[in-house]
Amino acid sequence: MKAEQQQSIPPGSATFPSQMPRPPPSTEQGITTESELAKKAQITPNDVLALPGITQGFLCSPSANIYNIEFTKFQIRDLDTEQVLFEIAKPENDQENDESPQESARYVRYRFAPNFLKLKTVGATVEFKVGDIPIHHFRMIERHFFKDRLLKCFDFEFGFCIPNSRNNCEHIYEFPQLSQQLMDDMINNPNETRSDSFYFVDNKLVMHNKADYSYDA
């Protein structure tokens, strides 16, 4: 009896569009709205967890990142096969550039093959550096939506970061099981799968990045 051969997944790609699409606002009653959060002096993890859908814009400006947190490398691998599915790194000659990031730099568009949606568990390794201020209780909440449907919410702790350090860690993503119909819808509607990545220090929002995804590579 021959063992079933596992199909290799082509590596993904990423681009940084100059303009970010604005999804329709969520209109559910009795739930925290994006406009309400925009008026708050401090946004907490509980605030973003109460949002009914993907955000239309950013909930904080780049200047909120007083800790000078900068992500310099990102890699995704399939934990079952150890295959690297995606990798991107900031060029070395750009890492000394101290310019504040523009809005477009916080929005990335990923493109993967259709069978990426069948993965069960992936490891996401990030490398980042921090500035002169020590960081306590560094946390990321990442919410993935297809149109107005919440697919998965990930919640990770980075821990303590000493000043002027370069750090790396791997977070394990356990993907939800998707029906064939939903996978077909996601493949046939590129960039309608979106995510918000919220970064908190001491329960205060300091960074907000966004992404969208297509699965037609």
From Swiss-Prot:
Cellular component GO terms, alphabetical: cilium
Segments of this protein annotated with the region Disordered: 1-31
A biological process from GO: cilium assembly
Binding site for tetradecanoate: 110
Annotated Polar residues bias: 1-18
InterPro entries (alphabetical): Ig_E-set, PDE6D_unc-119_myristoyl-bd, PDED_dom, PDED_dom_sf
Biological role stated in the UniProt entry: Myristoyl-binding protein that acts as a cargo adapter: specifically binds the myristoyl moiety of a subset of N-terminally myristoylated proteins and is required for their localization. Plays a key role in ciliary membrane localization of proteins. Required for the establishment or function of the nervous system.
Domain writeup: Adopts an immunoglobulin-like beta-sandwich fold forming a hydrophobic cavity that capture N-terminally myristoylated target peptides. Phe residues within the hydrophobic beta sandwich are required for myristate binding.
Name of the molecule in the record: Protein unc-119
Organism: Caenorhabditis briggsae
Name of the coding gene: unc-119
